[in-house]
């Protein structure tokens, strides 16, 4: 390659659009389909209207949502286009109105459903990233940018809240929905643990399968105090026979021996007994019917939520959860037998990065839930006073706006995280570029965390080895390497599943016991 070609290539690669491209791509994806995904998840807002006798239920159905370009309402009531420089000088927020289709529906089991009011109403304002597709200066030439007071070399990728420039820090976290096996210590003994951070629709649950010092497996997950016997939980999920449980864990003779020890110690033999046992744990002292109801709710809601799929029957989902727990049990046993090494938490294959679009999606989800609670309250109040129920009277747009702007202004994010949003470092031009490409670890800087702070071989070409601060943040706050590419929109696994299916790969539930035994005999 000629010297001129190399220069041209490097200049085009390190242009201002490329330096903050990971922020733009993530945020644009959030505006295009991320917001709509959150609204589709919510689907409808239920109310308490209809609880009394002779009263028809009322609910709100949510439709399409869209954000327009940033505007400002002047004192005379007129709306004008807002540019970033004007927002900086006037100390206002660079945000755009968000419109959502909402329908108020009334109807009961006997009565036909009637739509009382349908309209696209303004539900709040969304802070817009400077330089994103919805930004008013997107696509402007250098001359046009200079004309409106913008710096043509400014990379964008930040928000303007009350006149202050705020950048969202890329967050580094352990990969969700992935089994990680490791050693741990309990009561002075070394034990084997398989864990997974099960995540779905903003809810994250840590599920642990531990092999205690007696060699028995125990499972811990949210909303259940202490741990539950592995065999009890798997039977509650629908795997009843000893043979089926052993087969789903492993066909290896040594692992089968471990599993037989667990089955001998089991207190329950049927699914009904297992659910009763679980009910006594999650609702002790309550009536039997309530205990059963609560036990079913807990295993459906809090145990491995990422295995829930829309349109899949509950029974099938439970069996899939049982198979997943069996895989976790196998990982524990393999670790105990020395067949596998403990997973490296610092390996970059076990890490995932949350960029601005992912962070905004989390924020929008909590803001929408707050808006839904407010709409429910306003509807019930209007109904109690016998007022006409219309969309515009029950939606207060400042509720959503406040929940979106305040965390970006302060840096205090949902889930108790702080320092997610920071003031853009304007010390010099390189400081801005560095700040836009910075990422932070959720680990506490007051703890040693020597291994997490160390350079890892898998960071080669992804993370800059030298750009990290001195002092307590050393190794926890890092920066992207210059030629780093961040893959995005990889959460949707449907295409991957279709591709694997076309290659003849069978899912775990489709593999029968006869198939496995035949295969092992042929080997």
Swiss-Prot record:
Swiss-Prot/TrEMBL GO biological process terms: DNA-templated transcription
UniProt organism field: Halobacterium salinarum (strain ATCC 29341 / DSM 671 / R1)
Protein name: DNA-directed RNA polymerase subunit Rpo2N
Gene that this sequence comes from: rpo2N
Subcellular location: Cytoplasm
Any single GO CC term annotated in Swiss-Prot or TrEMBL for this entry: cytoplasm
Known EC number: 2.7.7.6
Pfam families: RNA_pol_Rpb2_1, RNA_pol_Rpb2_2, RNA_pol_Rpb2_3
Catalytic activity: RNA(n) + a ribonucleoside 5'-triphosphate = RNA(n+1) + diphosphate
Compositional bias of kind Polar residues: 513-523
């Amino acid at each position: 390659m000629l010297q001129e070609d190399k220069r041209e290539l490097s200049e085009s690669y390190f242009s201002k659009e490329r330096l903050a491209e990971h922020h733009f791509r993530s945020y644009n994806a959030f505006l295009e389909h991320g917001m709509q995904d959150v609204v589709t998840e919510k689907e409808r807002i239920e109310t308490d209207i209809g609880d009394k006798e002779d009263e028809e239920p009322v609910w709100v159905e949510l439709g399409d949502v869209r954000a327009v370009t940033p505007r400002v309402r002047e004192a005379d009531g007129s709306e004008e286009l807002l540019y970033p420089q004007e927002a900086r000088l006037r100390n206002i927020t660079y945000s755009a109105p968000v419109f959502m289709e909402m329908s108020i529906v009334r109807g009961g089991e006997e009565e036909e459903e009637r739509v009382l009011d349908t309209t696209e109403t303004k539900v709040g304002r969304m802070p817009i990233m400077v330089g994103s597709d919805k930004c008013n200066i997107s696509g402007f030439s250098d001359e046009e940018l200079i004309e409106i007071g913008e710096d043509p070399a400014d990379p964008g990728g930040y928000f303007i809240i009350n006149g202050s420039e705020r950048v969202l820090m890329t967050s580094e976290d352990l990969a969700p929905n992935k089994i990680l096996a490791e050693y741990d210590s309990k009561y002075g003994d070394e034990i084997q643990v398989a864990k997974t951070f099960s995540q779905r629709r903003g809810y994250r649950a840590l599920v642990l399968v531990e092999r205690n010092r007696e060699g028995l497996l125990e499972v811990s997950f949210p909303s259940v105090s202490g741990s539950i016997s592995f065999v009890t939980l798997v039977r509650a999920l629908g795997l009843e026979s000893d043979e089926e449980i052993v087969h789903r864990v492993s066909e290896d003779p040594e692992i089968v021996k471990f599993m037989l020890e667990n089955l001998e110690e089991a207190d329950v033999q049927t699914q009904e007994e297992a659910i009763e046992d679980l009910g006594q744990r999650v609702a002790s002292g309550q009536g039997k019917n309530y205990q059963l109801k609560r036990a079913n709710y807990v295993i459906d809601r809090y145990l491995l939520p990422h295995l829930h799929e829309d349109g899949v029957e509950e029974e099938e989902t439970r069996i899939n959860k049982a198979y997943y727990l069996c895989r976790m049990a196998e990982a524990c046993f393999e670790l105990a037998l020395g067949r596998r090494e403990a997973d490296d938490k610092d390996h970059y294959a076990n890490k995932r990065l949350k960029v601005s679009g992912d962070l905004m999606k989390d924020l929008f989800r909590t803001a929408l839930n707050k808006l839904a609670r407010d709409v429910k309250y306003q509807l019930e109040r209007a109904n109690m006073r016998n007022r006409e129920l219309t969309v515009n009277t029950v939606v207060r747009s400042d509720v959503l706006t406040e929940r979106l702007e305040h965390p970006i202004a302060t840096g205090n994010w949902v889930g108790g995280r702080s320092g997610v949003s920071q003031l853009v470092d304007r010390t010099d031009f390189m400081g801005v570029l560095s700040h836009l490409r910075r990422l932070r670890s959720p680990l506490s800087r007051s703890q040693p965390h020597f291994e997490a702070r160390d350079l890892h071989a898998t960071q080669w070409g992804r993370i800059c080895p030298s750009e990290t601060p001195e002092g307590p943040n050393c190794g926890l706050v890092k920066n992207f390497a210059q030629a780093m590419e961040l893959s995005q929109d990889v959460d949707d696994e449907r295409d991957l599943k279709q591709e694997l299916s076309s290659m003849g790969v069978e899912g775990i539930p489709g593999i029968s016991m006869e198939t496995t035994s035949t295969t092992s005999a042929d080997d």
